[in-house]
Amino acid sequence: MIDIRSDTVTKPSKEMLEHIITAEVGDDEYKEDPTVNELEEFTANLLGFEAGLFVSSGLMGNQISLLNHTNPGDEVITTSDSHIQNYEHGAASFLSRIQFRNVQHKDGNLDLEDLDTQIKKSFYHKPNISTVAIENTHLSSGGSIIPFEDIQKLYEYTSSNNLKLHVDGARVWHAILENDTKSNYGEYCDSLTFCFSKGLGAPIGSILLGTKSFINDSREYRKKIGGGMRQVGIIASAAKFALNNRENLLDDHKKARKIYDE
């Protein structure tokens, strides 16, 4: 029996466990864990960002981004079926004290005309719209991929309208590898988070990416919500191993198509 409930039910391979056992560790609260430091720098460079922050989950990464990009009372534009709005236990209203505004979309890809209409409707009786959050791949649309060129267009729009763009990229490596697209997301969004424990196969962990200033502030927010960790290189080593073997996702895609076709 193959368990296909979720890509989160995977267990570490023997090779991954060996990396965990032999990981070099230190106190990450003091930025002294070499494995974490290496992972953060490597991942940031890989996706074109200035810096990264290792966090326990994608939810934590998303919520720290909102804490960074918004002020209490702001609105964040996203899709009505997004993970950040529907599947994070109301964390955005609890932590950031913001609300969401929804726009039309096709498979997670925002309708720019509707987005523009919503932005231009804003006036002093309405909440300030500060951030746009998209999800790539889009879970509620069956894991659909937002074309990279559409993210570029969206970022041009958000930048010209003084809005921040956050990408919930929990499974973004599916999109990057499947379409063999550019991975320089750092040029086309203000922040991005992705999970090592989804698809990539690590047991724990996600990473939040952005500018150095953004990540410095995010480190403080992580501490405030109890996300600071100590000898976390033990799990960061598994994340690095998973990321170095990301090409295996293409085999997963072939197997998924075979199951679907049969």
Where are these regions (language model features)?
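Conserved PLP-enzyme active-site core in the AAT-like
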Residues: 3-262
